């Protein structure tokens, strides 16, 4: 039976209409799936990533931001053995004399060293302008003594670097400034920085009991009351004052001069693998082996610029980090990272991994300290 014109037109109009579009929901992102998981699993995933990615990941969601800011993530990183060595730097402005704390941030997405920057830590607690003793132990930084309003103080505090939170320590028995410090056998030793006739010339803070006790040792009038640098190596504490170098034995309570240390040791120095690295004579980096009792030049770095004055060194995960002013009075701070390698004959060689300006300040500043913390 033939179709009528009306029915034909109706069929034609139906055939010409485009089929309805299917509604497709946007595919959920990987982060959306991850957010459906319990916090414990998300935390475990985040803890496995390098810290340099955390600022970017924090922008993804409130959950990521909350977990990355929590102290639990650093506990998880420690359990997973994913901790990293982070460089902390104290700069003091020539204009205000106020110390400020910074961290060296290694940017993700490439190995371009121009991305490495010193970043200020706004939440870091203020410290005395002069004379404080600073030492890093694992993930914490201890700040002891110093001068406030022209008076030496006996107070101290510790900063938990993963969260940048601060807690006060019990006061030392003796107020002191520019004291030598060294961590040994669970105790933090503080030496000098006060009247050499004080009965508490040496004190030890027990990290387990959180108490101070007088340390072994006789008063030493030969050592200047202001020390410049100190390190704990094995079971001894090496001390530099304004004139001489000394070695303190906490077990025996003895303090002896070390003339060999005096020949090269300078303020800008650090300890790596039980050896002291320092800028010494002829603008060379020298290495002191306390067991062999010998200084030796770090090989392979004959063209380093003369940066002995005002530079600071630190152990950056087994590499040597050097922080220095670009030139005297400059507002530019530079950093150089050197890989260390022991070759035939026991000689230590250095290779520059990168070197560039890491911050430009508003006014010239002094590099007070460089130290590395595990987080």
From Swiss-Prot:
InterPro entries: F-box-like_dom_sf, F-box/kelch-repeat_ARATH, F-box_dom, Kelch-typ_b-propeller, Kelch_1
Skewed-composition ranges (Low complexity): 1-15
UniProt key word Translocase: no
Span of domain F-box: 31-77
Keyword Repeat: yes
Kelch repeat copies, ranges: 140-186, 187-232, 275-321
CDD domains documented for this protein: F-box_AtAFR-like
Native source organism of the sequence: Arabidopsis thaliana
Region of interest (Disordered), residue spans: 1-27
Protein name (database record): F-box/kelch-repeat protein At4g39240
């Amino acid at each position: 039976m033939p179709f009528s014109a009306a029915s034909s037109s109706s069929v034609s109009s139906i055939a010409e209409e485009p089929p309805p579009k299917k509604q497709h929901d946007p595919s959920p992102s990987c982060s959306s799936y991850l957010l459906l998981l319990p916090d414990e699993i998300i935390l475990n995933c985040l803890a496995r990533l390098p810290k340099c990615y955390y600022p970017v990941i924090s922008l993804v969601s409130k959950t990521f931001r909350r977990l990355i800011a929590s102290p639990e993530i650093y506990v998880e990183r420690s359990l997973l053995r994913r901790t990293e060595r982070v460089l902390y730097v104290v700069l003091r402005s020539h204009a205000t004399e106020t110390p400020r704390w910074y961290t060296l941030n290694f940017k993700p997405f490439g190995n371009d060293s121009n991305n490495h920057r010193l970043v200020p830590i706004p939440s870091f607690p203020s410290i005395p302008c002069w004379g404080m003793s600073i030492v890093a132990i694992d993930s914490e930084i201890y700040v002891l003594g110093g001068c406030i309003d022209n008076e030496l103080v006996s107070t101290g505090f510790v900063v938990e670097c993963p969260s940048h939170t601060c807690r006060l320590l019990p006061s030392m028995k003796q107020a002191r400034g520019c004291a030598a410090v060294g961590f040994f056998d669970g105790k933090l030793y503080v030496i000098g920085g006060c009247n050499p006739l004080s009965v508490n010339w040496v004190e030890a803070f027990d990290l387990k009991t959180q108490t101070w006790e007088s340390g072994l040792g006789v008063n030493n009038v030969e050592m200047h009351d202001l020390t410049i640098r100190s390190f704990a190596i094995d079971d001894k504490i090496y001390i530099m004052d304004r004139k001489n170098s000394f070695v303190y034995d906490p077990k025996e309570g003895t303090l002896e001069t070390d003339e060999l240390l005096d020949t090269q040791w300078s303020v800008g120095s650090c300890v790596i693998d039980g050896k002291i690295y320092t800028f010494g004579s002829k603008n060379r980096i020298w290495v002191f082996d306390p067991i062999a009792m010998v200084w030796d030049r770090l090989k392979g770095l004959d063209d380093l610029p003369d940066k002995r004055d005002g530079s600071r060194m630190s152990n950056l995960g087994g590499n040597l980090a050097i922080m220095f002013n670009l030139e005297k009075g400059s507002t530019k701070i530079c950093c150089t990272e050197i890989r260390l390698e022991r070759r035939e004959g026991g000689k230590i060689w250095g290779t520059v991994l990168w070197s560039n300006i890491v911050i430009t300040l508003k006014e010239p500043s002094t590099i007070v300290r460089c130290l590395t913390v595990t987080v």
